Amino acid sequence: MNLSTRVMLNRLTQQCVYKRIVTFSTKTAEHVIENQEEQKKEAPPTTPTSPVNRKTIIPANYRFVYPEFLPDPKVEWRNLVREKLERLDMLDRRKQIDLPEFYVGSVLAVTSSDPHAAGKTSRFVGICINRDRCGLRARFILRNVIDHQGMEVVYELYDPTILKIEVLRLEKRLDDSLFYLRDALPEYSTFDENMEAEPLEEGAPVPVNDIKVVLRPRPWLERWERQNLRGVANIDEYLKDKHRLSAAKVQKPWEKYDMMKDYRSSIPEEEQTEIFAEVHTELHALELQRKRNKRKRTFIKPKQLA
C-alpha cells in the first residue's frame, strides 16, 4: 500500500468516527428538554395557595370582661415596658385567686383580710357602682345600705389582701356608673348580707337590668340633669326652669361627632388585639379551670338526726 492510499484511509476513518458515544442508558440533552416541555404542556395549571392563617382567635368580649388589661389612653402616661410587666404580674395574681367576670350593676361579695376583725377576715356584700383605672391599679366600688346607713368600700382588684370575690348576681345596668344611687331611695342599694348566688346558665348572655331608680328630692351630690342618665326615672320632677337652662348651656352635642376625641380617649383596635393576643393563652386556661371547678360536685355529709 502506497503513501497516497494510506493518507486517504486516515481521512475516511476520521470522518466516519462519532464525536460522542451515546449508550442505551443515557439520553441526549435535547431529548430531555423536549420531554420536560411536553410534561409542562400536559400538566394542569396550578393555582397559588395562600398560607394558612394560624393567628389566635380572640373573643370579641375580652375588652369588656378584662378592661384592666388595656392601658390608659393618655399618651403622656404610656410606658410599654411597664405595661408589659404589669400584665405579667396580673396573670400571676389571677393564678393565685379566681377573679370572676362582673360589670357595673353586678352584686358581689368580697372577702378580705382585716387585722382588726374578730376572725382576721371581713366580708362585704354590695352592688358595683363603678369600675375605673387600669393595670395593677384597677379598682371597683361596692355599695350597700346597712342599718339605714349607706356604706361604700373601694377595693383594688389585684390587692393581695383580697381572699375571695363572689358574684352573687351577674348583670349590667343602663349606665356606665351608678353614683346616682347615693341620692336614690335606699331600697335600690340594700342587699342581704346572707344573699345566695343566683346561677346563670353557661354561655348565656349577661342580662341587662333596665330598672329606673327614683331619686330623693334636692339637694343632690351632683347635677344629674347634666349627665344624660338612662337609669333614673324622676329627674324632671325636681327641676326648675333655671336648672334646665343651665343644663342646656353646658351641653356639647357635637362631641359625638368628634372622631379625634374618640381616638384619644380609647385604645385602637389593632393595639387591643395585640395586647389580648399576648395574654389570651393564660386567660383561656384560667377560664377552663374555672369552669371545671364550677362543675365539680361537692359532697356534703348529712347531719346525724337526734
Swiss-Prot record:
InterPro entries: Ribosomal_bL19, Ribosomal_bL19_sf, Translation_prot_SH3-like_sf. Disulfide bonds: none annotated. Keywords: Mitochondrion, Ribonucleoprotein, Ribosomal protein, Transit peptide. The keyword Electron transport does not apply. Residues 34-43 have a biased composition (Basic and acidic residues). The keyword Mitochondrion applies. GO terms for biological process: mitochondrial translation. It is found in: Mitochondrion. One of its GO terms (cellular component) is mitochondrial large ribosomal subunit. Pfam families: Ribosomal_L19 (PF01245). One of its GO terms (molecular function) is structural constituent of ribosome. Coiled coil: none annotated. SUPFAM superfamilies: Translation proteins SH3-like domain. Its main location: mitochondrion. Residues 34-53 are annotated as: Disordered. Belongs to the bacterial ribosomal protein bL19 family. Component of the mitochondrial ribosome large subunit (39S) which comprises a 16S rRNA and about 50 distinct proteins. This is Large ribosomal subunit protein bL19m.
